[in-house]
């Protein structure tokens, strides 16, 4: 299972008023995703990036039956939950905690926050959706209380069907998230400057 391997950057946790949890994609690294921070309006944030064992949060597509991705998926969700609980113990309120993920990390980000919906600082998902062979509404509880959420994706995308992105946005909106969802025609499986600009405007603008 996943070891607790956390890389930090940005402001010291002891001094920061906000913290951003960053989740890398399949085959990526914590250092990798931390490099994205230089393009975001997060200069006064502490940055926390867990490293997935073997660089992968779960083995199969996020659209596979959930049991196929176990026990890795539960372990990955547990890693994120441990990070959040550690931050709360250090004095951060949940509305001071932000999340960002790309691809597999975006799926994990969305899955974690929607299973534990509350007022967070904000959420950014670059190409991702809720996990499972279908949406399981019974897995999700809580209320986002207008937490700003940005979801950007390509149509088509080789890993993430746009229909799942729409379904994910609807679940988040039902839980009172303030969702900005943008679908880019033929963008490819990547992060673009426009997505970064939109994420900065919608989520990292306080």
Task: Enumerate the language-model features and the residues they cover.
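C-terminal catalytic histidine-bearing segment of alpha/beta-hydrolase fold enzymes
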Residues: 26, 166-169, 173, 177-206
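Short beta-strand/loop motif that positions the catalytic acidic residue
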Residues: 149-153, 157
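Short beta-strand immediately N-terminal to the catalytic nucleophile in serine-hydrolase-like folds
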Residues: 99-101, 126, 152
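A conserved short beta-strand
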Residues: 118-131
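Active-site signature of alpha/beta-hydrolase-fold catalytic machinery across serine-
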Residues: 35, 111-115
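Short alpha-helix in the alpha/beta-hydrolase fold that links the catalytic acid
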Residues: 33-36, 137, 161-171
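Serine-hydrolase catalytic machinery in alpha/beta-hydrolase-like enzymes
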Residues: 2-94
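Gly/Ala-rich beta-loop-alpha elbow adjacent to hydrolase catalytic centers
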Residues: 100-105, 109
């Amino acid at each position: 299972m996943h070891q607790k391997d956390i890389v930090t950057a940005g402001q010291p946790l002891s001094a920061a008023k906000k913290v951003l949890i960053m989740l890398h994609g399949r085959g990526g690294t914590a250092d990798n995703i931390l490099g994205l921070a230089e393009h975001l309006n997060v200069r006064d944030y502490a940055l926390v990036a867990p490293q997935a064992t073997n660089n992968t949060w779960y083995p199969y597509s996020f659209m596979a039956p959930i049991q196929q991705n176990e026990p890795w998926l539960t372990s990955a969700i547990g890693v994120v939950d441990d990070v959040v609980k550690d931050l709360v113990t250090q004095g951060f309120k949940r509305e001071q905690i932000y999340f960002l993920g790309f691809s597999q990390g975006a799926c994990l980000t969305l899955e974690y926050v929607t299973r534990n919906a509350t007022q967070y600082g904000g959420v950014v998902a670059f190409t991702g959706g809720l996990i499972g062979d279908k949406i399981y509404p019974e897995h999700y509880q809580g209320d986002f209380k207008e937490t700003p959420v940005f979801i950007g994706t390509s149509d088509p995308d080789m890993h993430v069907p746009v229909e799942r992105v729409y379904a994910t946005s609807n679940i988040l909106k039902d839980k009172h998230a303030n969702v900005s969802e943008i679908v880019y025609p033929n963008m490819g499986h990547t992060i673009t400057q426009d997505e970064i600009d939109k994420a900065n405007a919608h989520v990292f603008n306080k």
